[in-house]
């Protein structure tokens, strides 16, 4: 499938999951929590599946009371601490990766992702990432898919305690790299987080409706739209 993007802009700012990366994770299945409990027991923290799942959600909710975006590393570290295990940064990072890998069913690029990124770089455009995500999950996945090299700067919500559609997250990127909204195009698959969020700071927008997108509404109008035919969507 060939997808073309208007090359009249200086800056191109991408969402990640559901826009560039096609991902399916499942955190609701018992086998994930059984595996995580076993992992914690291996490192001296005794849990069964129900207990670690309950503890995980408890600590996530506690972190969300402090900030609209959390750092999931703090959650996994607390799960060790309450069992008397002093987990160092290396163990916490490994735990984050284990959780993510175990809960991921598929991770791949959409067929248009590389051609667009390559075309933008070939034409000397600035390419940035602005993603609602956890750095401990995301950077590893981007490295695995070999796409880090296409981005001039990467901004992940867990680093800043704020996320889309909050204009503050967009403004962080704009201020740090000196981006002019009028010279920028935001590309994303979520009409609220990506399109309305980018429009709130004056950016033009390119909406792509993928298998990971929330239900489409005609009430939100992007500058450009690409609606994937049902037969082209991945299952």
PLM region descriptions:
Residues 1-12, 22-23, 46-47, 90, ...:
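Asp-based, Mg2+/Mn2+-dependent phosphohydrolase catalytic module
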Residues 3-111, 115:
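N-terminal helical cap/lid subdomain that shapes the substrate entry/recognition surface
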């Amino acid at each position: 499938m060939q997808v073309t993007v208007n090359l009249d802009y200086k800056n191109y700012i991408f969402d990640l999951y559901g826009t560039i990366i096609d991902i399916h994770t499942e955190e609701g299945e018992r086998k994930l929590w059984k595996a995580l409990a076993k992992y914690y027991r291996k490192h001296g923290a005794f849990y069964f599946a129900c207990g670690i799942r309950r503890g995980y959600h408890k600590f996530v909710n506690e972190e969300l009371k402090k900030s609209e975006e959390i750092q999931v590393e703090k959650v996994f570290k607390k799960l060790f601490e309450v069992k008397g295990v002093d987990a160092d940064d290396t163990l916490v990072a490994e735990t984050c990766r284990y959780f993510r890998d175990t809960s991921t069913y598929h991770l791949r690029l959409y067929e248009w992702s590389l051609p667009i990124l390559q075309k933008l770089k070939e034409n000397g455009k600035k390419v940035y990432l602005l993603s609602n995500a956890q750095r401990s999950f995301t950077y590893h996945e981007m490295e695995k898919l070999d796409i880090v090299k296409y981005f001039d700067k990467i901004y992940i919500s867990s680093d800043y305690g704020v996320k889309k559609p909050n204009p503050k997250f967009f403004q962080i990127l704009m201020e740090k790299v000196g981006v002019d909204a009028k010279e920028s195009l935001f590309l994303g698959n979520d009409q609220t987080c990506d399109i309305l969020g980018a429009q709130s700071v004056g950016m033009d927008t390119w909406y792509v409706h993928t298998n990971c997108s929330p239900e489409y509404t005609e009430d939100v109008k992007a500058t450009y739209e690409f609606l994937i035919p049902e037969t082209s969507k991945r299952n």
